[in-house]
């Protein structure tokens, strides 16, 4: 009887620790960063080191430029200079 109670207790303890890992459906990662506004001016190309696009789960599509100083600047992906910088960074 003691063995059965111990085994059941251990099983419940393991289930309690594992449950939070399975609470979200697979493939439903929340967005890590979203932009709520865009920069109002064009960045100097020499300051931009890299870029990434925000998640499709964000309410506003954006391109985030990473600068030499480590800043992250949100830009409108439909702006011509933004698409030009993205193409340039892809080639280099």
Swiss-Prot record:
One term of GO molecular function: chemokine activity
InterPro entries (alphabetical): Chemokine_b/g/d, Chemokine_CC_CS, Chemokine_IL8-like_dom, Interleukin_8-like_sf
Location relative to the cell: Secreted
Keyword Hydrolase: no
UniProt record, GO biological process: cellular response to xenobiotic stimulus; immune response; inflammatory response
Annotated disulfide bonds: 34-58, 35-74
GO cellular component: extracellular space
Subunit structure of this chain's protein: Homodimer.
CDD domains (alphabetical): Chemokine_CC
Sorted UniProt keywords: Chemotaxis, Cytokine, Disulfide bond, Inflammatory response, Secreted, Signal
TM annotation in the entry: none
Similarity-based family: Belongs to the intercrine beta (chemokine CC) family.
Signal peptide positions on this chain: 1-23
Free-text function comment from the UniProt entry: Monokine with inflammatory and chemokinetic properties.
PANTHER family the UniProt entry points to: C-C MOTIF CHEMOKINE 4-RELATED, SMALL INDUCIBLE CYTOKINE A
Protein name: C-C motif chemokine 4
Keyword ATP-binding recorded: no
